[in-house]
Curated annotation (Swiss-Prot):
Keywords: Ribonucleoprotein, Ribosomal protein, RNA-binding, rRNA-binding
Bias type Gly residues, positions: 21-31
Lineage of origin: Bacteria, Pseudomonadati, Pseudomonadota, Gammaproteobacteria, Chromatiales
InterPro entries per record: Ribosomal_uL15, Ribosomal_uL15/eL18, Ribosomal_uL15/eL18_sf, Ribosomal_uL15_bac-type, Ribosomal_uL15_CS
Region called Disordered, residue ranges: 1-52
Keyword hit for RNA-binding: yes
Binding partners and assembly: Part of the 50S ribosomal subunit.
Protein name, entry field: Large ribosomal subunit protein uL15
Organism listed in the record: Nitrosococcus oceani (strain ATCC 19707 / BCRC 17464 / JCM 30415 / NCIMB 11848 / C-107)
GO CC field: cytosolic large ribosomal subunit
Function: Binds to the 23S rRNA.
Length: 144
């Protein structure tokens, strides 16, 4: 095989459709665009979302809410997951090491879900009201 002998597979390339070359071609005069109107003109097509001057959908629909930038780095941990951490004090680094939270997590909150059967000491982790009661009832403590 040589570079000068390489060719496309048969039927892989279609001939370009030449328009505006007489009635007999089937694509003469109007070239398949029909008569008059915006879509028959050169460069005549609306932008995406244009509804003919009517207020477009993306502007009619009400806007609400926002995405908190802090929430992107916040992760929730259940009470029963804290038993999987084998250190004296549970902090963000210990939770990452135990593979309970991803490395990108900056803020962690413990929520009251599941049972806590051993006392744990939390450091630098937010706690819900129900989780705080459960941790203190199990003999644990929460440091800020």
């Amino acid at each position: 095989m040589r570079l000068n002998t390489i060719s496309s597979a048969p039927g892989a390339k279609q001939a370009e459709k030449r328009v505006g070359r007489g009635i007999g071609s089937g694509w003469g005069k109007t070239c398949g665009r029909g008569h008059k109107g915006q879509k028959s003109r050169s460069g005549g097509f609306h932008k995406v979302g244009f509804e003919g001057g009517q207020m477009p959908l993306q502007r009619r629909v009400p806007k609400f809410g926002f995405s908190s930038r802090k929430a992107r780095f916040r992760v929730e941990v259940r009470l029963d997951q804290l038993t999987k951490v084998n250190t004296d004090t549970v902090d963000i680094a210990a939770l990452v090491k135990a593979r309970l939270i991803p490395k990108w997590a900056k803020r962690v909150k413990v929520i009251a879900s599941g049972k806590l059967d051993k006392p744990v000491s939390l450091q630098g982790i937010m706690v819900s009201a129900g989780a705080r009661r459960a941790i203190e009832a199990a003999g644990g403590r929460i440091g800020e």
